[in-house]
Amino acid sequence: MNSLFASTARGLEELLKTELENLGAADCQVVQGGVHFQGDTRLVYQSLMWSRLASRIMLPMGECKVYSDLDLYLGVQAINWTEIFNPDATFAVHFSGLNDTIRNSQYGAMKVKDAIVDAFTRKNLPRPNVDRESPDIRVNVWLNKDTASIALDLSGDGLHLRGYRDRTGLAPIKETLAAAIVMRSGWQPGTPLLDPMCGSGTLLIEAAMWATDRAPGLHRGHWGFSGWAQHDEAIWQEVKAEAQTRARKGLAEYSSHFYGSDSDARVIERARSNARRAGIGELITFEVKDVAQLSNPLPKGPYGTVISNPPYGERLDSEPALIALHSLLGRTMKNQFGGWSLSLFSASPDLLNCLQLRADKQFKAKNGPLDCVQKNYHLAEKTPDSKPATVAEDYANRLRKNIKKLEKWARQEGIECYRLYDADLPEYNVAVDRYGEWVVIQEYAPPKTVDAQKARQRLFDIIAATLLVLEIAPNKLVLKTRERQKGKSQYQKMNEKGEFIEVSEYNARLWVNLTDYLDTGLFLDHRIARRMLGQMSKGKDFLNLFSYTGSASVHAGLGGARSTTTVDMSRTYLEWAERNLRLNGLSGRAHRLIQADCLGWLREANEQFDLIFIDPPTFSNSKRMDESFDVQRDHLVLMKDLKRLLRKGGTIMFSNNKRGFRMDLDGLAALGLKAQEITQKTLSQDFARNRQIHNCWLITAA
C-alpha cells in the first residue's frame, strides 16, 4: 500500500474524501487543503484518472527538519532517489514556503535540485537533467516553519488541466472547482442543465463528463509518473482501457441534454470547441444570447437545473451593470423557470441577494485567493395569483412619485439636469440626479453605527430599483459615494475616463463629467442663482470667484455681460470653464480666465466690476492658499475686499453651503453694505425638501 496525498481547493476537502472513498481509497484523513489516504498501485492510477476534485496526487517521500540550508540539502539527499527515477529521466522541483533560513523559494528549489543531482553523481551515475516545462518527474517540497515535506507529484501538470480546454482564454474557474460546483448544485444527471452565462463552457462540460461516466483524465497526454521507477505500465493501460470503455457506454446511453448561452459569440465558439475536444459536444446546445433573451428551453418539462458562475466586479463603476444583471436573472428565473432548481457560484454574496430569492443551501469555497459562496435555490412554480417580487418597494414608489411631479416641470423649465430624489426616506440615504439620459446615484456615507454589509445591500437594492423604475441601461447609471471631503480629496480624480456629456440648462449648454470626479461639474442647487445672474448681467462687467467650471460665467455671458472674469485655483476646472464658454460662443478678450488663489487675487486686484458672484468653500486649508479660510469666521474680511472691487451701484451675489450660516449684518453695515437673503428664491422644486442645501444673499452698498 502507498501513502498518498490529494490536494484540492480550500472548502472541497470533505467532498474529495467522499470521492476517494468511492474509488476505493482507505484510511482517508481530511486536512486543510487536501486528503491523506492509502491505496495500492491500481488505486494510484484510478485516483489520477477519475478524481474530478483533486488538484494533484502526491506520493510523500519523507520529511526533514530545516534549521540551515545544509539541513535541507542533507534531508533531501537522504532519500534514495536512484530507486525513484532513472538518470535518463528529466525532473523539476517545485518549492513553496519560507523560514528564517530559506528566505527565497528559488534558493530552496536550487538546494533540493543540487541534493538530488548529487545523489546520482555520488553513485557514479549520470547526472539527470532539469526540465522546468515538461519533466518526467516533479518533486514537490513544502517548507512549513522548520519542517520540509518532500513528495513526488504523480500528476505532472495540475489535474484541472483535463486536456479539452483551449488555454488561450483565461477561465474564471478551474475544472476541478467547476466539477465541485456541479456536484454541490443538487443537479441530478439525466435531467436538463442550463448555464445562461456559460463562458467557455466549463461547468456544462464537467457536468456532461460526470453524467456520461467520462473520466476527467482521459484526454491528458502527460503524467508525472512516466519517469517513476515504480510505474506499472500494464496496470495503467488496464485503468485507461476501462475508462475508455465506460466513456463510450456512458455517452451512448445518455439521453438528456445541456444548454449553454453567452452574449459573446467568440466565447461561445470556444465553448463548442472545448466540448468537442472533451468528447461530449453532441450533448450541449450552445447559443449566443444574453440574459435578457433567456427563455426556458423546455417550457413543458421536464424540470431541470440552472447553474452558473455569474460575473462580479471589484470596481465601483461596474456595480450598476452587475446589479442589473442579477436583478434581471432573478426575475427571469421566477418568470420562466418555475419548478426548476438554481445554483449560483459567486465571489459577491451581495450580488446574489439582488436575485430576490431565498437560498435553500449554501456552501463556501475558495476560488484562488477569493472567498466564494455557492447558493442553491428552488424556484417555486408560478400560479395565477403569484405576485411579482419587488425590490426596495418604498423607495421605488417614492421615486415614481417624484418623477411624475418633476419631469413635466423640468420640460417646461428647459432643463435636463435635476434631482429626482434626495434621501426622502431615511433608510434609503442617497441622492439621485438626472443628467439627460444619464442618472447619478450618490450614496451618503452611512454612519459607523450602521452595519456595513446591510448598508451595501441597501445600496444594491436602490440601484436595482432605480434601473427598473427609470428603465435605463445599466451603463447610463453612475454610482458615487459622498462623504465629508477633506483637503485635496474634493479635487482628486476618481477615474480617468475623460467622458464629457453636453447638457442644457435654460439657454446654456454645458459640459458635465459624471465619472472622473466626485462632483459632476454642475451644482444643480445653484441653477436658479445662475439664471438670476444671467438676467442681471446685461451690459455689465461680471466677476466669478471660486468659479469651479464657470457655468455662472456662461449664464452671465449669454445674458449680455460686457465682460466676464472667471477665477479659480484649479487649472483643470479653468480649462473646463473655457470649454463651457466656447460651447456657447463666448471667447476672446471679453472673457478672461485666471488661475489663482481667489483670496490672494482678491487682495491684490484693483479692477472694478458691476456684478460679482462668489461661492466660496465652507472651509479650506489648501497648501496653495496662504492661510486657512472659514466662511463663517472670515466672510466680513471677504466682503471688505469685494467692496473695493464693486463699482458704484453694483451687486454681489454671495452663496455658501454652510448649514446654520449667520450673516454678520452689523459688521456689514459697518462696512457700508447691506444684505438681502434670497435663499428661498434660489431653491427650485427638485430641492424643495432640502431648504439648507445652500444660503444665498444679494449684497449692495447701504
Swiss-Prot record:
Q: Give the E.C. number(s).
A: 2.1.1.173, 2.1.1.264
The UniProt catalytic activity note for this protein reads: guanosine(2445) in 23S rRNA + S-adenosyl-L-methionine = N(2)-methylguanosine(2445) in 23S rRNA + S-adenosyl-L-homocysteine + H(+); guanosine(2069) in 23S rRNA + S-adenosyl-L-methionine = N(2)-methylguanosine(2069) in 23S rRNA + S-adenosyl-L-homocysteine + H(+)
Keyword Iron in the entry? The reply is no
Q: Which Gene3D superfamilies match?
A: 3.30.2130.30, RNA methyltransferase domain (HRMD) like, Vaccinia Virus protein VP39
* Cellular compartments per GO CC: cytoplasm
Which UniProt keyword terms apply here? Answer: Cytoplasm, Methyltransferase, RNA-binding, rRNA processing, S-adenosyl-L-methionine, Transferase
GO molecular function annotation: 23S rRNA (guanine(2445)-N(2))-methyltransferase activity; RNA binding; rRNA (guanine-N7-)-methyltransferase activity
Top-rank taxon of the source lineage equals: Bacteria
Which intervals hold domain THUMP? 43-154
Q: Where in the cell is it found?
A: Cytoplasm
What is the uppermost EC class here?
A: transferase
Instruction: Please name the Pfam families in this protein's record.
Output: Methyltrans_SAM, RlmL_1st, THUMP, UPF0020
By its UniProt entry, which CDD domains does this protein fall under?
AdoMet_MTases, THUMP_AdoMetMT
* Stated family: Belongs to the methyltransferase superfamily. RlmKL family.
NCBIfam families from the UniProt entry: PRK11783.1
Q: Which HAMAP family match?
A: 23SrRNA_methyltr_KL
Q: What does this protein do?
A: Specifically methylates the guanine in position 2445 (m2G2445) and the guanine in position 2069 (m7G2069) of 23S rRNA.
Write the protein's name.
Ribosomal RNA large subunit methyltransferase K/L
Q: Which gene carries the instructions for this protein? A: rlmL
